[in-house]
Amino acid sequence: MEFATVSPPDPGAAAAARARQDTLTKPRGALGRLEDLSVWIAACQGQCPPRQFERARVVVFAGDHGVARCGVSAYPPEVTAQMVANFDAGGAAINALAGVAGASVRVADLAVDADPPDDRIGANKVRRGSGDITVQDALTAEETERALSAGAAIADEEVDAGADLLIAGDMGIGNTTAAAVLVAALTNVEPVVAVGFGTGIDDAGWARKTAAVRDALFRARRVLPDPVALLRCAGGADLAALAGFCAQAAVRRTPLLLDGMAVTAAALVAEHLAPGARLWWQAGHRSTEPGHALALTALDLEPILDLRMRLGEGTGAALALPIVRAAVAALSSMATFAQAGVSDPSAHP
């Protein structure tokens, strides 16, 4: 599918936010990165001061990967379906962390190798499991288009329902292997640079994972620079849908927090699908996966947090949400020097 042109966040609102920051009762720049975030939020909303986020929404994209049968994960493939049920029951880490951050959670089954718990979760299902990318394409061309369209449709559904900030999450045994292929292909690095320990594999598991990425990358590099073909060859329905989701959020001028390796790999593809989309995103955190740092560098995104996390699900991004809300509060609720009757150092050189 083709995405509409992405327009950048409002530069006038950004300039107004930066100017307002300099009038607040604090030394200029004293709130550090919080000030930069507030300027970004004002630009995304097109107003200064910005509104507080009231309808943050996490969407977890779930799918199985045939490469999981190559011993690339510490967990068996059936865990994906089991975790989808856990999300639905409210018992996963993302449920707990999103709850304390004030965000609601939706899970979407794109390619879990099992029947979905209900029609709502499976409404966008493309297939049961994606292909083993070491020997075959992850998807057909038609499935790739369906997955991209599904991700874009989910973004539209959430924005139309009132979401004012989106958080992208993932679940899929083997998905960091596919993600490493996407990142290595788009940043032109070798597998050993992009592959991490994922769910906690040992050295032998890392070697198997690196070999799997090597084999898939050999095939994936043949289809570059076509981002849709790359998703077909090495992505999977969940990652393709994530790419569509991230791209369409930007088209809809809705700020989005990225999570870890799988999400950011998909976002890297999304930036190729919809140039300029990255201006609507923030990196919620930096995971311990080496490929994640590569993808963030390629997107020119600075992570908000670094807590040595590697779970996925949207957990790192959910933890960043209170900081984003704090940035809004500082810009919108602090008094100016004039309002507070405090001497402004800039007025007395």
From Swiss-Prot:
One of its GO terms (biological process) is cobalamin biosynthetic process. Its EC number is 2.4.2.21. It catalyses: 5,6-dimethylbenzimidazole + nicotinate beta-D-ribonucleotide = alpha-ribazole 5'-phosphate + nicotinate + H(+). It comes from the Bacteria. Keywords: Cobalamin biosynthesis, Glycosyltransferase, Transferase. The active site is at E313 (proton acceptor). Gene3D superfamilies: 1.10.1610.10, 3.40.50.10210. It is an enzyme of class 2 (transferase). PANTHER family: NICOTINATE-NUCLEOTIDE--DIMETHYLBENZIMIDAZOLE PHOSPHORIBOSYLTRANSFERASE. Catalyzes the synthesis of alpha-ribazole-5'-phosphate from nicotinate mononucleotide (NAMN) and 5,6-dimethylbenzimidazole (DMB). Belongs to the CobT family. This is Nicotinate-nucleotide--dimethylbenzimidazole phosphoribosyltransferase. It comes from Mycobacterium avium (strain 104). The gene is cobT.
